[in-house]
């Protein structure tokens, strides 16, 4: 990678730390999730939730959203300056579900943001603990990635819906910092940049004046983040062109869309972290586990181990399949929405099916849904094996391109081939190789054409038994080479709407 000297591990970004050694990183990540756990326990006490109610993932999500809203400085400021009817800018809340006489009831609660901030800080040794907030944002983002499709958003920015595997983190808020930037997919960054350029085309003052200077700095920073995700010199050179453009316009949009398409084969490096719902950390803290002392990692065995020993429940609508609901949450917990289903199935130990075959809607329940018919069931979040999360796109041997699939962005560092339909992808690259970036485009297309679907990625990497915490005996799975493994085939999920 380019900036080897200054690169921080994504645990460090997650905890806002400078360079630390492995033990310090484990301790600071442990401190972060321990703080989330303590906060959750305190909120359950405040709300008088029973043990069962506290393990309900819908209650966990409401509590997480409340603390995120309480710390959303920009939105809080905006709400105070633009008072809207029926919204108290100083309060936050949401639905809490309680078990009453064998039925589930919804209760809407409202809290002072100041009070929530106080409880959060108290759980985090008096600090703002921004890292913990980002961690919750990434968990929500991973849940959205597994639940919704972004076809409409892709089409609106002129991209192809088949590029959905590049959209990791597309619902992360802007304020999610370095840890958030690390988990954003190539498509997400391209989309943010295209939106920005389009605003500049429509609003001539966008790049001008004092505000314009700040906008420009943000634009160049986003370009650099995206550049850092690409692994080939030609893709990076194209990003330099886009960044240095005096007056970004349609030519830059074209270049960005070209780069996004190229990332289907020349994949970018996108980090993956297992971020769990707050109630899981709460359960562990309540049972006396000391995260800071034991240390914790988001990319190793720890989250798997935590999920082996946690019982989490979910509300289930009348015609939903509890096993499918479990799969959805399992994928979200391991940030595996864009992983090859063959790999996920092997690790989980039960077959993971494409989203088009799931009989389940999202985890959150809308306020107009009838609670009378709601049931609840245990989420099966355990796994057969564990594997190390990756931040590489799985391109084989360093600089060369490897076969990418039209919809996979590997999560686990496990050996596999990446089957892809080269014809489908290459069809998108006919024609336009003229203009300033022609030599780079030609080079990128050449690399893509030389990629072979039978190449093996993550050579020699395997999964591990849950008893093998030091990762000493890798088990390298063998996969059916022909089997296409994308979660998004035959997709009928609902769109993500804010």
UniProtKB/Swiss-Prot annotation:
UniProt short sequence motif Bipartite nuclear localization signal, positions renumbered to this chain: 198-216
A single Gene Ontology CC term: ribonucleoprotein complex
Subcellular localization, as worded in the UniProt entry: Virion; Host nucleus
Pfam family, one: Flu_NP
Xref: InterPro entries: Flu_NP (IPR002141)
Keyword Ribonucleoprotein: yes
An MF annotation (GO) of this entry: RNA binding
Residue ranges of the motif Unconventional nuclear localization signal: 1-18
Region described as Disordered: spans on this chain: 1-21
PTM per Swiss-Prot/TrEMBL: Late in virus-infected cells, may be cleaved from a 56-kDa protein to a 53-kDa protein by a cellular caspase. This cleavage might be a marker for the onset of apoptosis in infected cells or have a specific function in virus host interaction.
The entry's keywords: Capsid protein, Helical capsid protein, Host nucleus, Host-virus interaction, Ribonucleoprotein, RNA-binding, Viral nucleoprotein, Viral penetration into host nucleus, Virion, Virus entry into host cell
Keyword RNA-binding recorded: yes
Main subcellular localisation: virion
Coiled-coil boundaries: none
Domain of life: Viruses
GO biological process, one term: viral penetration into host nucleus
Subunit structure: Homomultimerizes to form the nucleocapsid. May bind host exportin-1/XPO1. Binds to viral genomic RNA. Protein-RNA contacts are mediated by a combination of electrostatic interactions between positively charged residues and the phosphate backbone and planar interactions between aromatic side chains and bases.
Function: Encapsidates the negative strand viral RNA, protecting it from nucleases. The encapsidated genomic RNA is termed the ribonucleoprotein (RNP) and serves as template for transcription and replication. The RNP needs to be localized in the host nucleus to start an infectious cycle, but is too large to diffuse through the nuclear pore complex. NP comprises at least 2 nuclear localization signals that are responsible for the active RNP import into the nucleus through cellular importin alpha/beta pathway.
Family under the similarity heading: Belongs to the influenza viruses nucleoprotein family.
Name used for this protein in its record: Nucleoprotein
